[in-house]
Amino acid sequence: MPRSGGINGNFIDKTFSIVANILLRIIPTTSGEKEAFTYYRDGMSAQSEGNYAEALQNYYEAMRLEIDPYDRSYILYNIGLIHTRNGEHTKALEYYFRALERNPFLPQAFNNMAVICHYRGEQAIRQGDSEIAEAWFNQAAEYWKQAIALTPGNYIEAQNWLKITRRFK
């Protein structure tokens, strides 16, 4: 269900909503594309306010309507963010993978996948399983390398971790 206000107290969100509404009126799109974007915009607004259940409902509806793979990748990415936030890491990884299938140029998805893998590696260490931890850390390294390859100036902490752990080649 589209939000009636559409604009919250955040200046950036207000600006985004205003620009989005203007673009919806002037760019030639089908009614389905406009409706999908409206749900996506409402999902982003709900997500920024911490209303994750509402955000997911809007994103799922946007996915039902959106046909463009590139646009779908961002919807899937945002669904992954919510699952990450909720501690549902397996679901989050699934949505990040699905986003990357449609758009392999999402460094933030690679980064988030790396963060989850690194976290799981730390959990394995706490549980005393260094072999499993090493596998998770190696997977994190691969994802961070992909993120860094796409945006070399970003993810400085990840670059430092890769160097310190001798995983950067």
UniProtKB/Swiss-Prot annotation:
UniProt-listed SUPFAM superfamilies: TPR-like
Any one GO cellular component localisation term in the record: chloroplast thylakoid membrane
Membrane topology annotation: Peripheral membrane protein
Highest taxon listed in the record's lineage: Eukaryota
InterPro entries: PSI_Ycf3_assembly, TPR-like_helical_dom_sf, TPR_rpt, Ycf3/AcsC/BcsC/TPR_MFPF
Keyword Cell membrane: no
Residue windows of the TPR repeats: 36-69, 73-106, 121-154
Primary localisation category: plastid
Key word Repeat present: yes
GO BP, sorted A to Z: photosynthesis
Keyword field: Chloroplast, Membrane, Photosynthesis, Plastid, Repeat, Thylakoid, TPR repeat
Protein family membership: Belongs to the Ycf3 family.
Main function: Essential for the assembly of the photosystem I (PSI) complex. May act as a chaperone-like factor to guide the assembly of the PSI subunits.
Protein name: Photosystem I assembly protein Ycf3
Gene label: ycf3
